[in-house]
């Protein structure tokens, strides 16, 4: 099972554990993933995803899943999130609007 955030693509990273005597030992940092259901109000759909806790905090701060995707640069999003973002933009262009928030 892959430990990668489905929204941002955040994955396991590597670094050094540094002891008191300043010895450096390789170690890895895992992503704090949670299985969540994110709701798109524009599309009227739910998406089951594995999302990092850091990304969840950012989604709440930005005002919801739709606003987070629309206000985040595409290069910072995973391929799956970019597809959802395109669907949201198409829905808005065809006449649907965000119920809670300003673009």
Swiss-Prot record:
Taxonomic superkingdom: Bacteria
Record bears the keyword rRNA-binding: no
The keyword Ribosomal protein belongs to this UniProt entry's keyword annotation: yes
One protein family per Pfam: Ribosomal_L28
Protein name (record): Large ribosomal subunit protein bL28
GO molecular function, one term: structural constituent of ribosome
Signal peptide boundaries: none
Keywords from the named record: Ribonucleoprotein, Ribosomal protein
């Amino acid at each position: 099972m892959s430990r990668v955030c489905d929204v941002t693509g955040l994955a396991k990273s590597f670094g050094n554990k540094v002891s008191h005597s300043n010895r450096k030992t390789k170690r890895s940092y895992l992503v704090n993933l949670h299985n969540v259901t994110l709701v798109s109000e524009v599309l009227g759909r739910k998406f089951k995803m594995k999302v990092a806790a850091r990304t969840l905090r950012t989604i709440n701060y930005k005002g919801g899943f739709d606003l987070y995707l629309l206000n985040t640069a595409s290069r910072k999003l995973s391929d799956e999130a970019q597809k959802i973002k395109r669907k949201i933009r198409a829905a808005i262009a065809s006449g649907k609007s965000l119920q809670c928030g300003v673009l």
